[in-house]
Amino acid sequence: MNIPFSPPHIDDAIIEEVVSALRSGWITTGPRTKLFEQKLAEYCGIQHVECVNSASAGMELALRWFGIGPDDEVIVPAYTYTATAEVVLHCGAKLVLVDVNDDLLIDVDKVRQAITPKTKVIIPVDIVGLPCDYQEILDLVNEPEIRKLFRPANDCQSTLGRILILADAAHSLGAYYQGKHTGAVADISVFSFHAVKNLTTAEGGAICLNLPETFHSESIKKDFNTLSLHGQTKDAFTKTKAGAWRYDVCTIGYKCNMTDVAAAMGLVELARYDQNILPKRKRIFDAYNQAFANDPRFRVPTYVTPTKQSSYHVFTLRVNHITEEQRDLIIVKMAENGVAANVHFIPLPMLTAYKSLGFNIQDYPNAYRQYACEISLPVYYDLSDEQVNEVIRVLKAAVSEVL
């Protein structure tokens, strides 16, 4: 039996909708993208969503919109994928890494210690689908002493009057925090629809706007739309209307719009997300939890609490009392027996690009401790009960062999 890690589910409904988009004669940003944005906004319980070609692009656009650049500081957890940090560096800002808790989420006490008058943005990461402690983070940035530290440099920053909370929600579509969907909690949240995500458009992302009422949400959406299309005031679909060919370029923008072909996939996936996709993933999580929770060799991830519900994106199992080398050997032995496993993620200070910036993993001990014993197990739509049982059997056998 060969069990991959996370292949996408592509069925006839998706193929038919994509073919329909292709046959329509409109394959770039158009009516399907607009409809997908509308449906996502309704799903999250917010007013406006702007779809883009990746979560990375969405996060960078958010930073650019907020005016982030040299002399600014942005706080990011050390335990995340490189995309979260790269967007900060692309803007020329100083990247400030902080450690995480045992649940892999950003340590708010470490965030507090890292805030300076130059801090403009905090990027919490809903790692593997579990929402961060947003109320604690929002309470922190709204503390009078923290607000006094904030030094606005433009109109957006002055209007907000505090540090921006930009959620890297790449993993957490469908998760809940205090009864609200992710996307409706932080000031701005960005989802990913990459091929391995719960909901995929092959490549894609979405910017969810949940800014205070002092901002005009519809106007901000237009700002993001303009930034995503070279700073142009009209997209290609709008220019097809009679007499509407003339446009302006009002700012120096980027090219990161979503296509209607991608949105076609997203519309099919979103329509069945809560009733079909999430329940299947939860069933797999529950099976793994039942198999490992009472075995002292393992520590299962938190995926439901009184205030949080995960999106069931990745099952991050920890194996107790092992070294990084033993963990790697377990993954090799699983592969030799037909089961693909992974690690989420290598902490940023362990990667060459970040070492060269002066980061040292010794400064982030908990990020390393969690990484060194973590194994991510297969979770995907078409994974059968038989295959889940095989993953469990193979992993337990590999651990017994290594230990």
Features from the language model and the residues they span:
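N-terminal "arm"/small-domain region of PLP-dependent enzymes with the aminotransferase-like
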Residues: M1-I27, P31, D248-C250, P378
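Phosphate-binding glycine-rich loop
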Residues: W26-E73, V87-C91, L97, I146-L149
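PLP-dependent aminotransferase class I/II
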Residues: K34-Q38, I46-Q47, V121-V125, L130-L138, ...
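Structural detector of well-ordered beta-strand residues that form the stable sheet scaffold
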Residues: E50, I75, V96, L164-L166, ...
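PLP-dependent aminotransferase-like
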Residues: R64, I68-A169, Y176
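Hydrophobic/aromatic ligand-binding patch that stacks against planar heteroaromatic rings
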Residues: E86-V88, H181, V261
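Conserved active-site segment immediately N-terminal to the catalytic lysine
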Residues: C156-T200, W245-C250, R299
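Short beta-strand-to-turn element immediately C-terminal to the catalytic PLP-Schiff-base lysine
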Residues: F191-S192, G205-T214, L267
